[in-house]
A protein has these predicted regions:
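Membrane-proximal HAMP signal-relay module
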Residues: 1-49, 63-71, 85, 217, ...
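Conserved catalytic submotifs in the C-terminal HATPase_c
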Residues: 9-11, 115-119, 137, 142-153
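A conserved beta-strand-to-alpha-helix junction within the catalytic ATP-binding
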Residues: 13, 115-133
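Conserved micro-motifs of the catalytic ATP-binding
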Residues: 109-114, 154-157
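Short helix-loop "hinge" at the ATP-lid/N-box region of the Bergerat-fold HATPase_c
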Residues: 173-174
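Short beta-strand/loop element within the Bergerat-fold HATPase_c
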Residues: 183-193
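Acidic ATP/Mg2+-coordinating residue in the GHKL
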Residues: 201
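Short conserved segment of the HATPase_c
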Residues: 206-220
Length: 275
C-alpha cells in the first residue's frame, strides 16, 4: 500500500541480515524521496496560488485606471499623468512577477543561463541605478547612490543576472514600503578582496525571528501573509541562488519599523584583489 513508515530490524550479520540492511537503506531513500516530492508539490501549488493572487492585484488596478482614462474621470493633465504612472508601475509589477516565475523554472531544472565576463563595478552599478531610478522616481521614492570603490575595480559576473539581483531586492523593498517618504540607498563598498553591495530601505522592517528565513524558497513573513502585499515567496531565494552561483555571500539586517538592509559580496578579479 506504499507504507514506508516501518523499520527493518537487522540482528544478524549473515546474508539474510545483509539483505535486510539493504532493504532498510532502500526504504529510507524511498521515504525521503516521497517526502521531498510531497513537499515539492505543496510548494508548487502554493506558488501558483500566490502568483495568481499577485497577478490579479495589478490587473485590477490597470483595468480601473484605464477605464478612468477612457471615461474621462481623469479630467486634468495632472490626474491623467497620475493614472498613466500608476498603470506603468503596475505593469512593471506584473513583468517582475512573470520574470520571477520564468527564472524559478530554470532554477528548478538547474538550467540557469549564466554568461560570465569582466565587469567594471563603478560603471555597471552606476548604469543600474540610472535604470531603476526612473521607476523609483515615478513611485515617489527617493534614491541615494554612494560608490566607494575605485573606477578601475572589476568583478567576474553575469551582467543580466546581477541586474535581476538588484531589481528583485529593490522590488522587495517597494513591496513592503510603508512610509509616505520612501527612501532606498545603494552603497558600493571596497572590503579588501571583495566588493560589498548594500541596499537599504526605510520600510516596515523584518522581525528578528523571521530574518534568518527570508532567503528560503517560498518563505513569506507573517506581515506579508496577513496583508494585501502577497508575494510569490521566491524573489529573494532567486537572489541568493544567483549570488552563491557567483561565489558570493548574501545576508540581511533589519529593525521593525525602521527598515531593512540587504548586503552581498562579490570577489574582485585577481588583479584587483589584495595580494
Amino acid at each position: 500500500d506504499g507504507n514506508l513508515d516501518f523499520t527493518l530490524d537487522v540482528e544478524d550479520d549473515d546474508e539474510i541480515g545483509q539483505l535486510c540492511q539493504n532493504f532498510e537503506e532502500m526504504r529510507i531513500r524511498l521515504k525521503e524521496s516521497t517526502e521531498e516530492k510531497i513537499q515539492y508539490d505543496k510548494e508548487s501549488k502554493e506558488l501558483i496560488s500566490n502568483i495568481s493572487h499577485d497577478l490579479k492585484t495589478p490587473i485590477t488596478a490597470i483595468k480601473g485606471y484605464a477605464e478612468g482614462l477612457m471615461e474621462g474621470v481623469a479630467s486634468s493633465p495632472e490626474k491623467r499623468d497620475k493614472y498613466i504612472r500608476t498603470i506603468y508601475n503596475k505593469a512593471n509589477d506584473m513583468d517582475r512577477l512573470i520574470n520571477e516565475l520564468t527564472f524559478y523554472s530554470k532554477i528548478d531544472t538547474n538550467k540557469i543561463p549564466y554568461t560570465f565576463s569582466k565587469i567594471n563595478v563603478a560603471n555597471y552599478f552606476r548604469d543600474c541605478v540610472e535604470e531603476v531610478g526612473l521607476e523609483l522616481e515615478a513611485r515617489g521614492i527617493e534614491l541615494g547612490y554612494f560608490n566607494f570603490v575605485d573606477e578601475d575595480v572589476m568583478v567576474i559576473a553575469d551582467a543580466e543576472q546581477m541586474k535581476r539581483v538588484i531589481n528583485n531586492i529593490i522590488g522587495n523593498s517597494l513591496k513592503y514600503m510603508d512610509k509616505k517618504n520612501g527612501i532606498i540607498n545603494i552603497r558600493i563598498l571596497d572590503v579588501g578582496d571583495f566588493v560589498q553591495v548594500e541596499i537599504e530601505d526605510n520600510g516596515k522592517g523584518i522581525g528578528q525571528k523571521e530574518l534568518p528565513y527570508i532567503f528560503d524558497r517560498f518563505y513569506r513573513t507573517d506581515s506579508s501573509r496577513n496583508s494585501s502585499k502577497g508575494g510569490s515567496g521566491i524573489g529573494l531565494s532567486i537572489v541568493k541562488k544567483i549570488i552563491e552561483d557567483h561565489g558570493g555571500k548574501i545576508w540581511a539586517t533589519s529593525k521593525l519599523g525602521i527598515g531593512t538592509e540587504i548586503h552581498f559580496v562579490l570577489r574582485k578579479t585577481a588583479g584587483d584583489a589584495q595580494q
